[in-house]
Design a protein with these regions (language model features):
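Glycine-centered hinge/linker elements that transmit conformational signals in sensory
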Residues: 237-269
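Hinge/lid segment of periplasmic solute-binding proteins
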Residues: 30-47, 118-174
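Extracytoplasmic "Venus flytrap"/periplasmic binding protein-like
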Residues: 71, 78-148, 185-188, 279, ...
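Bacterial signal peptide processing site
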Residues: 17-19
Length: 450
């Protein structure tokens, strides 16, 4: 997925419930080619009146995800008679197209995007309608509530301020430390920070430092383990800036982040994405902390290079640092929303339920190498370690960057957090000075917001 997270998506959840019960029959993923030749499943929910719907998508029609969604839309038409008109608008459309349209009569019925961006841009503007009733709709193999684990539907990340569901997910993204199993035989995941530092060795960590979102992940991951889900977002939204200093976890996280910075490859802040990520794929670095799209991007790069080089992807999570008590794992979801002014909300909701049918949603892992919220779908081998971590009941789900990147519609991260974090990684700020700067810059930022 490409990049600055939506800005990373435009450039590539605080509760964890038990996974949904698996389907009774064992299911194997089809090949990418076979997926598009499988029979369309029956629709568990058919609109009583709507005969059409308009869908604005964050994907392009030629992307694997777009191809899967187009196929599902065609199947939906065959099984329900509802015509689906799709506009393939790309990653930035939410703010460029949908947000300006909210005050007009020209809005789609259905749209999709990551939760952070939807909440910051569309929910905050009153542009969505509640989707709690979708949970009771039938997919082709159970209700939506049956097939979606609570971890992906019963969290603050996917609910508005009134506690209403504003979106329904169909793709799950995580992040992890990635390595090549072929190059590190007998690998054992670190269980302490000292073990992690020993593992990282000398200048072995790849980072495209020109992407502020990527560079922020080290501090973000560590801080979340000290202050818990919601802690980063609260500090970012504190108009006094004092929370950065009153909770000692932020300073401890900064100290570990500064130490990780000593393991970054030379030139990490001098390249242009994806140069450093490609160096990792070429074997110039041993480890890469990246989202679940990392294997797809690096595999595509190696394929374009030619030759027989390949990566046997393995991954692991950050260990708990000393004194930390929150064993978290970051999650982001791509989800469907229905606009408040939708002319065909019944059809839009029925399509959401239909796409969550196992045989249709299987296209996301089979064709697009993407994780889904359904626990009964097999996953690409590259993502098996990450999927296991996401489903570990001992881990608490938290939103990517705790949603900090969506604060003040993203301007807080761009103006305050990313610059300070980059200076911490470069050694221009000591950990204590970094926390001091966040405190003063946060207070100054909110004074300018009125």
């Amino acid at each position: 997925m490409k990049r600055t997270y939506l800005a990373v998506l435009a450039l590539a959840l605080t509760a964890c419930g038990a996974p949904a019960a698996p389907a009774e029959d064992e299911f194997s993923l089809p090949t990418a080619a076979a997926y598009f030749t499988t029979a369309c499943p029956e629709a568990g929910t058919k609109p009583a009146t709507d005969k059409e719907l308009t869908y604005w998508s964050m994907w392009t029609k030629d992307e694997p995800q777009g191809k899967v969604l187009r196929y599902a839309a065609d199947c939906f038409t065959r099984k329900t008679g509802v015509k689906v008109t799709i506009q393939w608008l790309g990653r930035g459309y939410l703010r460029q197209n949908l947000l300006p349209a909210l005050n007009t009569g020209t809005v789609p019925d259905l749209f999709d995007q990551d939760l952070t961006t939807v909440k910051a841009a569309i929910v905050s503007a009153g542009g969505t309608r509640a989707l709690d009733d979708v949970l009771s709709l039938r997919t082709g193999d159970g209700t939506v509530r049956d097939v979606l684990p609570a971890a992906y539907r019963d969290t603050s990340a996917i609910k508005d301020d009134a506690g209403r569901l504003f979106a329904v997910p169909y793709i799950v993204m995580g992040n992890a430390w990635w390595y090549d199993r072929k190059k590190i035989p007998g690998f054992t995941a670190p269980t302490t920070m000292d073990e992690l530092y020993a593992l990282l060795g000398d200048r072995s960590v790849a980072l495209d430092g020109d992407i502020g979102y990527y560079a922020a992940w080290y501090f973000d991951q560590l801080a979340a383990r000290y202050v818990g889900p919601g802690g980063l977002a609260r500090a970012a939204q504190d108009p006094t800036g004092r929370l950065w200093k009153s909770d000692p976890g932020f300073l401890k996280a900064a100290e570990h982040t500064a130490r990780i910075a000593t393991h970054l490859v030379d030139g990490w802040d001098a390249g242009k994405f994806p140069q450093i990520q490609q160096r990792w794929a070429d074997g110039d670095a041993a480890y890469l902390f990246m989202g679940s799209w990392g294997p797809t991007e690096t595999r595509e790069y190696l394929a374009k290079q030619g030759g027989d080089q390949s990566i046997d992807y393995g991954s692991f999570q950050f260990p708990l640092p000393p004194g930390a008590t929150h064993d978290v794992i970051e999650v982001q979801q791509i989800a469907f929303g229905v606009t408040a002014k939708a002319k065909h909300p019944e059809a839009a909701k029925a399509f959401i339920a239909y796409f969550l049918t196992r045989d249709l949603l299987a296209g996301m892992p089979a064709v697009a190498d993407s994780l889904t919220p359904r626990s009964d779908l097999p996953v690409p081998s590259d993502l098996a370690d990450l999927k296991a971590a996401l489903e570990d009941p001992a881990k608490k789900h938290t939103l990517f960057m705790d949603g900090l990147d969506g604060v003040a519609d993203g301007t807080f991260a761009e103006q305050v957090f990313y610059p300070a974090n980059n200076d911490l990684l470069r050694g221009k700020l000591a950990p204590a000075a970094f926390v001091d700067r966040l405190a003063t810059a946060t207070a100054a930022f909110w004074k300018t917001q009125g």
